Design a protein with these regions (language model features):
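Conserved N-terminal phosphate-binding loop of PLP-dependent enzymes in the Aspartate aminotransferase
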Residues: 1-451
């Protein structure tokens, strides 16, 4: 089948989603609240979820492997999380606007699981966390360039929205490629692109820019599923420390998914700063930036540093403090849900990893039966399906995959009850039990017969 033929079946399969999309595009650009939620010819519209299942507006149900791009590691509506949230709601105040005990309670739990984090601040998303981590690096070092790994994503703001999906230049000396309109030209000069899993080339570039580089920010597992080598991680930690460059781990995707202690627990490496999000918020918007006390204390408020205190207007010391604020930072309902999620994961994490391994092995066998080159690439509870024989180590290796065939399979899978955005990574949850895996394998066999 051609992709166009598959799309015709898909349109007939989901007429209400199509209609809702046509209405949405009249008032929302592209019909979606975030660009990542769109796919051709239109995305499915959901109305509910329970456990491993998503329910769409046309009456179909799907095993959910998108997990909202990773946060839903317990699936939809996990009882212990719902119960904790309802108790918090019954307190009568959703939001205080003041400090509260849950802030320190969550911070202590995160410190326990992530020993590199001595202190932390809360944000409202992973994007906010990475943005604030870079401001911290600038404030601490007095330098304003950063190193960013090719193919790594750290949010939708200007300095890091370079070379995420695009590759240009020598493989050992990538060029910065803008991934959006509206990026200031100087961002290309201030963001140095580094080759992932190439320690020698990365070291050479860092040594060239050491006097002007504040930090290297990276996903220890590229796009959440392609792991760095231990050699690269050990070497990068050594060279950044030697050159006085801060090392920032963006663990928004890997936190609580590669291991309970994230990728840094898996690799046994302590970064200077860590960014968390996704799983930590249990499906609600939350982020964390944490790390060394001497760096975090740059954000501690001083008398006279409140930018909103008019009485300090003539003697403000705001410029002496790293400003950080947010109405919803440390939201009590979200911290409640996050603490409940961590409590479940401390009992269930090994099970989820085991189910992930079973799913990967079963899918590899199905593709082998069809004689289609395929490998699952991942670590912990996340992986992706790449249709290539090339060993996946670097960002540009991923581009050898047959994404055209993978996309056809994914659309056919939607019509067999398996939900993921076409070509996206798989995020496994605590509710993907053996029956769900068997359903998945059968759906794959049905879909691939139609190819």
């Amino acid at each position: 089948m051609t992709l166009e033929e598959i799309w015709k079946e898909y349109e007939a399969f989901a007429p209400t989603s199509k209609k809702q999309h046509e209405e949405a595009v009249k008032v929302i650009p592209g019909g979606v609240a975030a660009n990542i939620k769109y796919f051709d010819p239109f995305p499915l519209h959901m109305k509910g979820g329970n456990g491993p299942w998503l329910y769409d507006v046309d009456g179909h149900k799907y095993v959910d492997y998108l997990a909202s791009y990773g946060p839903l590691i317990l699936g939809h509506g996990y009882p212990e999380v719902k119960e904790a949230m309802m108790k918090q709601i019954e307190n009568g105040a959703i939001l205080y606007g003041t400090p509260h005990a849950l802030e320190a309670k969550m911070a202590e739990k995160i410190k326990e699981l992530y020993p590199s984090i001595e202190m932390l601040r809360y944000t409202n998303s992973g994007t906010e966390a990475t943005l604030f981590s870079l401001r911290m690096a600038y404030a601490y070092t007095g330098k304003y360039k950063i190193g960013k790994l090719e193919g790594h994503y750290h949010g939708g703001y200007n300095q890091v929205l370079l070379s995420v999906n695009s590759a240009k230049g020598d493989v050992r000396r990538p060029e910065p490629i803008p991934e959006s309109l509206g990026l200031e030209p100087f961002q290309k000069e201030n963001t140095i692109i580094l080759p992932f899993n190439d320690l020698e080339a990365t070291t050479a570039i860092l040594e060239e820019h050491q006097d002007e580089m504040a930090a290297v920010i990276m996903e220890p597992v590229l796009t959440g599923y392609c792991p760095a080598t231990q050699e690269f991680m050990d070497g990068l930690r050594e060279v950044t420390k030697r050159l006085g460059i801060l090392l920032i781990f963006d663990e928004v995707k890997t936190g609580f998914r590669v291991s309970l202690g994230g990728a840094q627990g898996y690799y046994h490496i302590k970064p200077d700063l860590t960014c968390l999000g996704k799983v930590l918020g249990a499906g609600l918007p939350m982020g964390v930036v944490g790390g060394r006390k001497d760096i975090l204390m740059k954000a501690a408020p001083l008398s006279g540093s409140d930018v909103f205190d008019a009485s300090n207007s003539k003697r403000s010391s705001a410029a002496d403090v790293l400003f950080h604020s947010g109405t919803y930072n440390g939201h009590p309902l979200i911290l409640t849900a996050g603490l409940a999620t961590i409590g479940v994961l401390e009992k269930k994490f090994d099970y989820i990893v085991g189910q992930t391994d079973k799913l990967r092995a079963g899918l590899e066998e199905i593709f082998k039966e069809k004689d289609i080159p395929m490998q699952t690439v991942g670590v912990g509870t996340v992986f992706n399906i790449l249709l290539t024989d090339v060993k996946i180590e670097k960002f540009r290796d991923i581009q050898t995959s047959d994404f055209a065939t993978r996309k056809k399979i994914d659309y056919l899978l939607l019509m067999e009850g398996i939900y993921n955005k076409p070509t996206n990574r798989y995020s496994v949850s605590a509710v993907h039990d053996d029956n769900i895996l068997d359903f998945t394998f059968e759906a794959y066999r049905k879909a691939m017969k139609k190819l």
